[in-house]
Design a protein with these regions (language model features):
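Unchanged
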Residues: 96-120, 128-184, 196, 200-202
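N-terminal strand-loop-strand
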Residues: 53-90, 118, 122
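Nudix hydrolase/Nudix homology domain
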Residues: 1-30, 36, 159-203
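Juxtamembrane/interface motifs at transmembrane-helix termini
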Residues: 47-51, 102, 194-195
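Conserved Nudix-box catalytic region and its N-terminal flanking loop in Nudix hydrolases
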Residues: 74-112
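Acidic, metal-coordinating catalytic segment for phosphate/diphosphate chemistry
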Residues: 24-27, 31-70
């Protein structure tokens, strides 16, 4: 098993231990386990201790994966992408809020980032972010791609996105691949072409 996966498991054990332990000395030991694991991850990846602390900030108790939803919208054979602050592009989406469902979160992010009103249609795939996107995340993230029907658009530049445009799948701009990779866009296109024949992909 990959060392980084084992170290992430140690952090999860440490967080659960702090949450459930009733002994102050055991709590200190579990906190120390987290510190050591984060130091080892920082040595073995491109992540700093500060980034690791931020990634796990607010985490406690038994650890479960984070959920990231991505809205997939087609219009005239072109796919909707939003431009991030650094100039790269991605499918509109983000963390799933605890008050949302998969589809409602995808539609919320679609409106907030692209100014698009849509209707959730179907699930295309669920992927483990660390298996399909470059760069290692200290968190386990499940990326859920939801195909949505386009209804209307009223985009305005905001703190998250600079632009929202439709692109031909064979003429894509530079992607923010940690969020949406070229392979993921290609799979979304395959699903679009397959229509009802498409079978949901799940890791």
């Amino acid at each position: 098993m990959d060392e980084l996966v084992l170290l992430k498991e140690l952090i999860a054990i440490g967080l659960a231990g702090v949450f459930y332990s009733k002994d102050v000395f055991d709590t200190e030991r579990y906190e120390r386990i987290q510190v050591i694991a984060k130091q080892l991850i920082a040595q073995r990846s491109n992540l700093t201790r500060e980034q690791l602390d931020l990634g796990f900030d607010g985490e406690y108790g038994y650890q479960t994966p984070k959920v990231d939803t991505r809205a997939v919208v087609w219009r005239g054979g072109k796919i909707l992408l939003v431009q991030e602050a650094d100039g790269r592009w991605a499918l509109p989406g983000g963390w799933m809020d605890v008050t949302e469902t998969l589809t409602s979160n995808a539609l919320k992010e679609l409106w907030e980032e692209a100014g698009v009103v849509g209707q959730a249609k179907r699930l295309i795939m669920i992927q483990d972010r660390n298996l399909h996107n470059p760069g290692h995340s200290p968190l386990t993230i499940l990326k859920c791609f939801i195909e949505c029907d386009y209804q209307s658009q009223n985009f305005q530049a905001n703190v998250e996105t600079l632009a929202a445009e439709f692109f031909a799948p064979d003429d894509l701009p530079e992607l923010f691949e940690a969020k949406s990779s070229y392979q993921q866009i290609a799979l979304c296109h395959e699903a679009y072409q397959a229509g009802e024949r498409w079978q949901v992909l799940i890791d």
